[in-house]
């Protein structure tokens, strides 16, 4: 029996850009050996960030008229990872896999009024061992 797997990670400003490099596949040499560069073209965005994550955060602050000093260790963003086991994805196929991640995205948009406006990026990776989605949001 398969289960939905969700992991949430709190991130400081210093940690955010490293996540962006990984999620957007900006590095030429990946430290994660599970990434298969021949499959990277299969990755897709449900919501694409226009800028780096820190610049998106700064744009978010300005757009929402949020002011004040943030400490260097302040949590500015969270990353949620949605996945399941490989058997689950093999059984449901490509079309239902896409629907699975679309439904995960919709769930978070509606969860406790988080709203799509707080989501910076949502990217599905199909070039690693098991399909998964990285969803970055401002808490």
Residue ranges and their predicted role:
Residues 1-139:
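N-terminal nicking endonuclease/strand-transfer module with a His-rich metal-binding environment
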């Amino acid at each position: 029996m398969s289960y939905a797997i969700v992991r949430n990670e709190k991130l400081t400003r210093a940690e955010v850009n490293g996540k962006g490099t990984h999620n957007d596949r900006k590095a030429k040499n990946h430290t994660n050996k599970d990434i298969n560069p021949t499959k990277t073209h299969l990755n897709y965005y449900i919501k694409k960030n226009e800028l780096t994550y820190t610049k998106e955060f700064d744009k978010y602050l300005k757009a929402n008229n949020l002011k004040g000093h943030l400490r260097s260790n302040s949590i500015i963003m969270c990353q949620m990872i949605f996945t399941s086991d490989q058997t689950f994805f093999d059984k449901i196929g490509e079309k239902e896999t896409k629907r699975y991640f679309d439904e995960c995205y919709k769930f978070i948009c509606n969860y406790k009024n988080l709203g799509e406006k707080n989501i910076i990026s949502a990217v599905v990776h199909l070039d690693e061992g098991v399909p998964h989605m990285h969803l970055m949001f401002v808490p």
